[in-house]
């Protein structure tokens, strides 16, 4: 269970990092992953 949580955290961090690189993030379509509305906290 802890492994799944770590994978989720890493996925969100990667999404946030790609959101900074708007051009590349738009190509991969991962930037919405870092939307504050999608985060539970």
From Swiss-Prot:
It is found in: Secreted. One of its GO terms (biological process) is response to toxic substance. This is Submaxillary gland androgen-regulated protein 2, isoform beta. InterPro entries: SMR-like. Residues 1-22 form the signal peptide. Keywords: Detoxification, Secreted, Signal. GO terms for cellular component: extracellular region. It comes from Mus musculus. The gene is Smr2. May play a role in protection or detoxification. Pfam families: PROL5-SMR.
């Amino acid at each position: 269970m802890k492994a799944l949580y770590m994978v989720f955290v890493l996925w969100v961090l990667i999404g946030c990092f790609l959101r900074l690189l708007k051009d590349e993030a738009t190509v991969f379509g991962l930037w919405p992953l870092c939307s504050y509305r999608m985060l539970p906290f």
